[in-house]
Amino acid sequence: SHRYDPHTPLEETMQALVDIVRSGKALYAGISNYPYEAAAFAYNYLLEHDTPCLLHQLKYNMLHRNPENEGLLAQARENGSGFIAFSPLAQGLLTDRYLNGVPEGSRAARNFTLKQDCLTPELLEKIGRLNRLADERGQTLAQMALAWVLRDSMVTSVIVGASSVEQLDSNLQSIRNTG
């Protein structure tokens, strides 16, 4: 289930997942963007119907630690579920892209998914401090941010985008610094 829908009975959504797996249209069941209580119901319902929830996908990065703070990482661990992090680079904030302001053509400049007014002086200073720390570690900010997300063995995968092969190669270097 890609997104928790408070307007649809959770039992109905979970039964649909059970039916999809049992019919062979999917191999496994997973959830995405579920709050703690809804995830607890989902884990229990699916397990009771012999279709265990194998993953929970949530936004997770150095600037957005809700899955950790709200107990969702621990909950996944307790239920034998994997955890997939999306937006590990905070829509580009945890890269060198915004270190010198908002570049033309960037997400923030387009004011689409990343609003310019979210880029407060405090946030930009925090990102600058993180960048200096990454530099001291011999990493780019993006590499350090990805390594930070991957440091927890509960994180089974991250969803990361790259606009070039060079960017992808650089991001892959983060796996050398997860220990």
Predicted segment positions?
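Histidine-centered active-site/metal-ligand motif
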Residues: 2
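Beta/alpha (TIM)-barrel catalytic core signal, keyed to glycine-rich beta->alpha loops juxtaposed to Asp/Glu
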Residues: 5, 10-179
